[in-house]
Amino acid sequence: MTLEQGVGAALVLLFLADIFLTVLYARAGTGLLAPLWTRVIWAALRAGASLFGRRRGPALSFVGPVIVVSLIGFWAFGLTLGAALVIRPELGTTIRPASGDTPTDLVTAMLVAGNSLSIVGGGDYAPHSTATRLLFLVNSLIGASVLSLVLSYLVQVYSGLRERNALALTIDLMTDGTGDAAVMLARLMPGGDSGNATSELGNLIAPLTATKEAHHFYPLLFYFRINDARYAVSRFGFVLLDLVTLIDTVLDQDRYATLIASSPVASLRRGTTLLLETLDAHFPTRGGREGRPEAIWAMRQSIVAAIRTLEESGIAVHHDGVDDYVSRRQAWDALTCRVAPAMGYTMIEIDRRSSAVQSLVKTI
């Protein structure tokens, strides 16, 4: 084996290990090459999307599919190049066409390698020794295996995307399309009756945990950005965290003690936090707005508006929970403020109640 063939074999093994860790081991951040490749493509496409101005959002919605195609192409090129480096020294001797001269350049080697991997057609080149026949056999097995693995991986990615979108739309419908957790809570407790609230919230736990695990299994989901903000992970994550914070701090502690201490409330809080932390840990995010005076003022205005909404719906509240709400919200607000801009959303699109309050203040 020559040095060139050794390098080629190592390159094939490197890409196979990357495919194994990404597709079969399937945990966020475990790939060798794929995480770096997807981040580079994301950064380049996001920078390019800024050239579209107001159409930046729709342009970013194409990033997810483009990254999928680019990653498949990256893997195919890497395997083909590695196999070509192994094949090239054998061209003209143990690997040759049925008739005519045999070019020994790298392009010809890549064409033959692509044929042996079943990626492209490579003419009538054939192996003429036991070792090269075994090489072609191994290459064909690698190509067929990788193709089936990638296809099944794509099915799972898009299945996870569909489930995520379904969860996001469900939560948006429960807010009556407002994106306001106070409206969602008011509709869960019509006339102050919390009888069905626990079961309704419990119905969200299974799809939430499935969405969280889908992002951990299939990191490509991070890069799928829907132009409509209602489908944003940061949007429905914000709504759920705001909802459980309102339940913990604003509802009457005696009348709604069962709801406040219920498992669904605790599960939604923890599950949503885990989902956002997964995105924050494995996706390029930047600092939030924690501790800034204008952010704290906005939180206070937001909770006052939420209390008003709940009172108008006949829900018993206590007004002493404002400081507690602000304190608890500060614990998770910075997380959503990091994730949302990373996906090209503004906090106006995510925190709908605060946006409505600020718009009202400006008109006065």
Report the location of each language-model feature.
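Alpha-helical transmembrane segments and their helix-start/interface "positive-inside/aromatic belt" motifs
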Residues: 1-5, 62-75
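Pore domain of cation channels
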Residues: 11-18, 68-75, 83, 103-165, ...
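Outer-pore turret/helix-boundary of cation channels
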Residues: 18-33, 76-111
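Membrane-interface amphipathic/juxtamembrane segments adjacent to transmembrane helices
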Residues: 26-53, 99, 163-179
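Short amphipathic alpha-helical coupling elements at transmembrane boundaries
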Residues: 39-46, 112-115, 136, 206
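Cytosolic juxtamembrane amphipathic/interface segments immediately preceding
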Residues: 50-67, 124
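Non-transmembrane accessory domains of multi-pass membrane transporters/channels
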Residues: 164-237, 242-243
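Soluble C-terminal extramembrane regulatory/interaction domains of multi-pass membrane proteins
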Residues: 200-203, 222-225, 229-364
